[in-house]
Amino acid sequence: MMRALIAVIALAVAVPAVAQQPPAAPPPKLPPVVVEGTRVPDERTAPEEQAREEIRRVPGGVDVIGEQGIKESRAANLQDVLGLVPGVWIRPRFGADESQISIRGSGLRNNFHLRGVNVLLDGFPYGNADGFSDFESLELLDTKRVEIYKGANALRFGGNTLGGAINLITKTGYDAGLIEVRSEAGSFGFFKNHLATGQVYGPFDLYLGLTDVELDGYRDHSDQMRRRVYSSGGYRLPGGTTVRFDLNYVRSQENLPGALTQPELDRDPRRADPANLNLRMKAARDYDYVRGALTVRTPLSETQTLEWGTQLNYQDLHHPLSFAVIDDTTYSYSTELRWINAAPLFDHGNRLTVGLQYFGTRQIDANFTNVAGAPAVLTKNQFNIANTVGLYAENQLDVTPAFTAIVGGRGQYSTREVRDRFLRDGPGDIDFNDSDSVDFLSFSPRGGFVWRAGRTAQVYGNVSHSYEPPLLLELTAPGQLQGNLGQLAAQKALQFELGTRGSLGKRLGWDLSVYDIELWDEIQNVNVQPFPGAPFTIPRYRNIDRSRHTGVEAGADLLLIEDLARRVGLGAAGDALRLRAAYTYSRFVFVDDVNFDNNDLPGAPRHFLRAELRYDHASGFWFAPNVETVPHGYYVNSENNARTQAYTAVGTRLGYTYKPWQLAVFFEGRNLGNVTYTSSVVVDAANRRFFEPADGRAFYGGLEWRFR
């Protein structure tokens, strides 16, 4: 298998295929190798091009989306922003924020929220101690850059997951105008308003962003509301130390339409699951969320930097579902110390990163019977605890001016504990005590290289191990056997990856990764009916003995024509026509499984292509028709007897920026053919409600004004 991978990469180096770059961007300049030690830049204040140079030090698949790429679309969820990043499979569940996210087959079991991908905020982990997280609390318009580390390539931040990491770099007072106003509106009752201000006062900088989002929804019972507040205050001390405090507040309310059967999807994709729409159930998810984070960055010398971050977040969740009303209160806190030393080693360029992390989560987990969406009779009352301690290190040594060797690893100790406070939950008030605890210990090594094959071309590769203990919600799911947290083993994976990236002048850019991941004990969600004929399912998790994920991630940015307007007498030079494309091949399979032999793992297509043809005029006008296609449907159950349907959806975007006034407008049309297709899926649903429809034909527009 690896010989085949090496052959593919050798061919790719000889005949480059391509990667996503921002439109009309200058050709990337790969980071030069220098023997002199250099100070590592501050991610919060580093310019975008410097961030791109930094991320190209990673010996694996990576990408960066800058502020322009964020703001030129609706930017309601990560699919809006990362649609042209190969290898990232993002599917909105019912229109707006909440999405299924899978990178290299991570989180195929997800039919809600996020797992298998580390979410980072400004380089530090975001979410709970067990790895559970979501993106609904984060506002993309308060973000100046999104960095994607695909697969086991996020060790520089302590990442240890199959899917890698998505790092959102948020704005500070250095990044915003005195006044920034943005308003968006569109189909299905979509409205989004954003007001922000940022300013620098000597050594102080302040940023404040306020966002209001409302959506009636394409489907019945899918209306949503978000209120977000984000603020950041920083202070630079003499000597270069920076201290920064960030504060987030979110109020979220959303109704849940649920999944459909194939006949329901064909007849009326706008309908909701009758069980979720039932007035006696009122399936919904409402919460309040608060997060405070303090970071300190201190230069110890010209080549050494010490970073410390700590955060506390609180969530109060009210979550009516068919089988229960979940009322949870969750507190999570973390602290991390990271030392970066870029001093030369034996007259060779070198960078050493060492980090120590601690995460803790405490959760009051109560379930009640559901009466019209309100809690009635208590059926579960637990105090759940998760702790994680991680120690990681990565060293990048420039063996020659053109070749960098990378070695590293992460040691981790994790615990999961349940303290049952509701003992009389058996027949006839029999005491069922579900209290239990379990721990996990691991070491995940990593080795890789980056070879600078030319001034603007790289070849890279790595062999990396990842380790993911089960989440609390997987150990305590209503479908699990009670009183034994040790049913689920941690998921282990060994990744082999080779790739190449770079550019040929300004005409061509490419990014190609080929990977083979061997997995043991992959965690899979089987959604079972709690009793025969039940109109709903409950989650039950199991380990798959052996599985394999292989794939190809190929991106392209090709300059087709430039200065066309000048040639035909329609304007000055500076216009350009570019073709950008992202292709993902994914083959995720069981390996000699006792039940499913070598079937496909459900949840992701073999082939996925998205492409955009974009014209930029020197006046500030741009126009970009696009297409995405899944040419063959993919399986949604492990038996491989149910699958989605193939689809092709076309859309278009256009906009205009009037720089003297700092005024920008955009317009977007999606699914212009009004094609009915599946956006996300509920895998292995016993009631065969697998399909969550994509939105029909939709139009969106927005206006933004900035005053410096």
Positions of the model-derived regions?
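Gram-negative outer-membrane beta-barrel transporters
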Residues: Y413, D511-L519, F536-N637, E704-R706
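Transmembrane beta-barrel wall of Gram-negative outer-membrane proteins
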Residues: L178-E180, A185-E214, R219-P257, A284-T295, ...
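Conserved C-terminal beta-signal and adjacent last beta-strands/turns
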Residues: R236, N395, G461, L494-F496, ...
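Short, acidic, small-residue-rich periplasmic hinge/interaction motif at the N-terminus
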Residues: Q21-K71, P299
